[in-house]
Amino acid sequence: MAIGYPNGKKYAASHEGIPQKKRKAPVTYGKRGMSLEDDLNDTIAYYLAQDIAVIHKKPTPVQIVSVDYPKRSSAKIKEAYFKTPSTTDYNGVYKGKYIDFEAKETQNTTSFPLSNFHDHQMIHMANVLKQDGIVFVIIAFQKIGETYFIPFEKFYPFWQRMQSGGRKSVTIAEIQDVSDQIPYGLNPRLDFLKSIEKLYF
């Protein structure tokens, strides 16, 4: 039986205004957009709050050149420069030992470019190692969600190889051979002290 309106027009079912069921994307509980720096800052805040270790991110020294004062109570920096090259990202104390490390991340999936490091950082880390400090590098491969703890004494030969005209990157296989993988967790986010415990204590 056909259904019609009083004015003679035929009824046509309309699907407008009816919400369509959308297919939900699978939920992933991975990194959710956090950077390596965010993860490490959360981790060291946890260590400090739990009285486990005292580690800080070093501020980069800046030389302010020009300041604008639009109001008496506010100032706007118009021009500034980095004073000196920074050494490493983080330093602190754990179980009476000085620790110093650099953290880098890459979007590459098969290798890490050594151009992410600088001469002054390598010199600084080598000097800390000479003084018996615990020195290491944390490298995150963001696309594959893997993060590695590499003792500096095992990372430095890759830098020396590049300086001698060799490869300008380190393959992920080479990194896996000399490192300890840091799993992601909730609290702490990246428990790199487990790697320190395993390798140094």
From Swiss-Prot:
Q: Which GO terms describe its cellular component?
A: cytoplasm
- UniProt family annotation: Belongs to the RecU family.
- Compartments it resides in: Cytoplasm
EC number of the protein: 3.1.21.10
For the protein in the UniProt heading, the enzyme class is: hydrolase
Query: Pfam families from the xrefs?
Result: RecU
Q: Which GO terms describe its molecular function?
A: endonuclease activity; magnesium ion binding; nucleic acid binding
- Annotated positions for site Transition state stabilizer: 104
Its BP terms in the Gene Ontology are: chromosome segregation; DNA recombination; DNA repair
Give the cofactor note text: Binds 1 Mg(2+) ion per subunit.
NCBIfam families, alphabetized: PRK02234.1-3, PRK02234.1-5, recU
Q: Could you tell me the keywords of this UniProt record? A: Cytoplasm, DNA damage, DNA recombination, DNA repair, Endonuclease, Hydrolase, Magnesium, Metal-binding, Nuclease
Disulfide partners: none
Please report the organism this UniProt entry assigns to the protein: Listeria welshimeri serovar 6b (strain ATCC 35897 / DSM 20650 / CCUG 15529 / CIP 8149 / NCTC 11857 / SLCC 5334 / V8)
Q: Which reaction does it catalyse?
A: Endonucleolytic cleavage at a junction such as a reciprocal single-stranded crossover between two homologous DNA duplexes (Holliday junction)
Output this protein's name. Answer: Holliday junction resolvase RecU
Give binding positions for Mg(2+). 87, 89, 102, 121
Q: Which InterPro entries match?
A: Resolv_RecU, Restrct_endonuc-II-like, tRNA_endonuc-like_dom_sf
> Which purpose does this protein serve, as stated in its record?
Endonuclease that resolves Holliday junction intermediates in genetic recombination. Cleaves mobile four-strand junctions by introducing symmetrical nicks in paired strands. Promotes annealing of linear ssDNA with homologous dsDNA. Required for DNA repair, homologous recombination and chromosome segregation.
Q: Its encoding gene is what? A: recU
Name the coenzymes or cofactors required.
Answer: Mg(2+)
Q: Name the CDD domains for this protein.
A: RecU-like
Q: What is its main location?
A: cytoplasm
